[in-house]
Amino acid sequence: MFHQKQFRNYCRCHAINNFLGYKAIPYEQFDKYCNEFDKLNNMPLISKNNCYFYNNGGNNNIFGYVLEKVKYICKLETFYSDKNIISKIGHCDTIDGFIIFNNHHTWCIRKVNRKFHLIDSMKWMITPLNNEKLSQYLRGCKGIITIKEISH
């Protein structure tokens, strides 16, 4: 399974690539997408330099923008520090993965063959998560973006 390791402050890029399962976005291209996204949103070019991702709900964030650029059409939904996350996201069968974030880092959980795997660019190994471990893990996260593929 693809596992891109940490390089500089590109954890958001690693999270997207790890979720997709291949190096879809080189670092230089990720920087360009950040700059484009900031200009579209009249922001002072903060996505690339400050690792900010401007979350206005749904797909209107750097993750939705980049996933659309690589033709991965999906629906994103964001939750913050929510102990009831599992009841709110519903059945995980419809979810393809998660982008997990806190103030300092971003990583992903990816579904492969109907099983979830924690893929963190700062960790040495990929960690499989059964439904119980997934539920426990998500309850402890500061921020979660669910990913549901519409078409690819």
Predicted regions located by residue number:
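Conserved active-site-adjacent core of cysteine acyl-enzyme catalytic domains
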Residues: N42-N103, V112
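Active-site nucleophile-adjacent alpha helix/oxyanion-hole segment immediately C-terminal to the catalytic cysteine
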Residues: M1-F53
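Amphipathic alpha-helical interaction motifs in eukaryotic regulatory proteins
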Residues: R12, I16-N17, C34, D38, ...
